[in-house]
From Swiss-Prot:
Both phosphorylation and phosphorolysis are carried out by the same active site and suggest a common mechanism for both reactions. It comes from Pelodictyon phaeoclathratiforme (strain DSM 5477 / BU-1). The active site is at H153, K174, D192, R259. It catalyses: [HPr protein]-L-serine + ATP = [HPr protein]-O-phospho-L-serine + ADP + H(+); [HPr protein]-O-phospho-L-serine + phosphate + H(+) = [HPr protein]-L-serine + diphosphate. Residues 217-226 are annotated as: Important for the catalytic mechanism of both phosphorylation and dephosphorylation. This is HPr kinase/phosphorylase. Its cofactor is Mg(2+).
Amino acid sequence: MNLDQKGLKKRSITVAYFFNTIGKKNDIKFRRLNEVDEQKRRIFERDLHRPGLALAGFTNLFTYKRVQILGNTETRFLNHLEEEERNRVFANLVRFKMPCIILTSNNKLPQNLLDMATNADIPVYVTRCSSTKTIYIVTGFLDDQFSLYQQYHGSMVDVYGVGVLLTGKSGLGKSEIALDLVERGHGLVADDVVVIHRKGESMVLNAKRNNIIDHFMEIRGLGVVDVRANFGIRAIRDVKEVQVVVELLEWNKEIVYERLGLDIKSRKILGVDVPLVELPIFPGKNITVIIEVVALNFLLKRYSNYVAAEALTDRINDVINREKGEEDSYE
């Protein structure tokens, strides 16, 4: 199954969406300072800009398509200018079609400058947060919005704190296995459609549910199951890092499957290598327990650098070497 698809990315978001959403997910509040149509302004980049050089008159390399941050330095520079010069400088700034302006640390602009921004259809906001905190939060929010993402067919489950992505052909029982794991106390992230994001150059992949399907599951022969209603809030997760891929395979007696676990495999998702476990399925095989052991093995390797197959191999080699040494001593 090819999971390494190119990935999609939002081209832009409206300033209205930015203003209405960021405060719900982050510890930051913005207040409007003017009334313009925020739907007409769009943000195209995750990077922000502090227009110090543009205020000083150098606009050759002005990245005006980014959200503009005016902190203590920029506002004090404007305020120390004579009114006529200040108006000229700010008029030169707002002639560019920027998404919006954010004032940090409760800084203020004279009303005539706000009127200039309004006439140019540029939204202006203010926050009590410092420039450092504002840039950190807004950059993180835009990172999420413009991150690479792709939708995959499968189920995503939190097993002992390990994010396990179940993949495989339709009809192999991915949803049934995920439901069994939920019944055993683990958490469902998504079923059928798993949305995976990669933020920036990070090597971390985060999986989320499809907002339409939410935490509903379709079980063949039973129908639709509402996991949250049936099992409670403890049975669901909003987001989880993809740490292990378990691919379910139809049993084929002609294929020699891995028996020791020394052959480490991986699957590339959005350019990131994720550990892969291939599980052949046949009637009577308890896949749920095996997936729990997969998660526990992942934790053992991550926190103790312990791999059972390597430990057994080392033990066998020690016995062989010891017996060989005893034979040499008899000679």
